[in-house]
């Protein structure tokens, strides 16, 4: 059994998803219903046919149905995808604890939970859509997610038509579905690099880290009401480290960072191709 506290990860993720800039704000009022995304009107299969005609990418299994979600559900979906990635790491970490107490084991699992929750919470503020695929687990079906509150907020900030924005984002994400479905080697290529990264990853909880973790756990209100004003500064620092890659770099070590850069290069190619297809097909 893994040691990662996934309940804490979801809790911290939802707290972080409400942070705006340096201050604390409630999540946007726009809900899935208020955005009124009608997946059927977007006609993802028809868009997929147009993308196939332009790119030659033809997935054998078609494309997933579009799913409008809010931030908590987006966080939950991504945490579920992370489980097969991080549970083996937590098992290795747990096996290395030896005679340490159950409290130390719980602290280690909570540390990963806080970090993963903060990362997904931060990303949940920015993601408009996502082709969600589990690279290391072939069993879950891929999903096409549209993050309704973020789409509503982006349309308002940019002063553009909501329906047009949703359509463009849909084209982008359907393109990702065809990239992976039409080029099966791509998934295994990324999965191979990811496996190597996860096999090399180590987590250690020192006294200093455990003290900071205890502070975060106390402030997060996992057992009661969160101390929002006090938690803001600590989470802002954690998010800052996540944004500049410091957390991941420390966790992996410099000798494995080259793999991260290789994955980033591959993802840049995938994203650039999707942007090109979006402009060509959506015009």
Q: Residue locations for each model-derived region?
A:
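Acidic, low-complexity proline/glycine-rich segments
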Residues: 2-15, 128-147, 235, 239-242
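Short helix/loop capping segments that flank catalytic or ligand/cofactor-binding pockets
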Residues: 154-156, 178-179, 188
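Short, solvent-exposed segments of well-ordered alpha helices
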Residues: 31-34, 38, 161, 257-261, ...
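Short pre-active-site segment immediately N-terminal to the catalytic Zn-binding motif
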Residues: 150-169
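N-terminal low-complexity, Ser/Thr- and acidic-residue-enriched intrinsically disordered segments
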Residues: 1-56, 60, 64-65
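Active-site recognition of the HExxH zinc-binding catalytic motif
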Residues: 165-181
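Auxiliary, metal-adjacent structural segments of Zn-dependent hydrolase domains
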Residues: 43-149
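Post-HExxH zinc-binding segment in Zn-dependent metallohydrolases
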Residues: 113, 117-128, 181-282
């Amino acid at each position: 059994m893994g040691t990662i506290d996934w309940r804490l990860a979801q809790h911290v993720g939802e707290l972080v998803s409400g942070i705006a800039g340096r201050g604390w704000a409630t999540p946007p009022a726009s809900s899935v219903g208020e955005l009124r995304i009608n997946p059927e009107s977007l006609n993802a299969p028809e868009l997929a046919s147009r993308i196939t005609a332009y790119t030659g990418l033809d997935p054998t299994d078609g494309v997933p149905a579009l799913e409008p979600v809010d931030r908590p559900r987006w966080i939950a979906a991504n945490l579920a995808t992370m489980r097969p990635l991080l549970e083996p790491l937590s098992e290795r970490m747990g096996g290395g604890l030896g005679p340490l107490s159950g409290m130390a084991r719980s602290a280690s699992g909570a540390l990963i939970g806080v970090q993963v929750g903060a990362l997904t919470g931060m990303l949940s503020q920015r993601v408009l859509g996502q082709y969600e695929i589990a690279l290391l687990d072939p069993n879950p079906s891929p999903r096409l997610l549209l993050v309704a509150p973020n789409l509503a907020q982006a349309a308002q900030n940019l002063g553009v038509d909501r329906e047009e924005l949703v359509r463009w984002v849909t084209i982008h994400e359907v393109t990702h579905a065809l990239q992976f479905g039409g080029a099966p080697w791509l998934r295994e290529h990324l999965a191979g690099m990811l496996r190597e990264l996860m096999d090399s990853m180590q987590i250690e909880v020192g006294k200093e880290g455990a003290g900071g973790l205890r502070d975060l756990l106390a402030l997060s209100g996992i057992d009661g009401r969160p101390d929002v004003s006090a938690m803001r500064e600590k989470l802002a620092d954690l998010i800052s480290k996540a944004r500049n890659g410091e957390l991941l770099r420390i966790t992996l070590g410099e000798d494995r960072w080259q793999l991260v850069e290789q994955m980033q290069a591959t993802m840049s190619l995938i994203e650039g191709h999707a942007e090109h297809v979006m402009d060509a097909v959506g015009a």
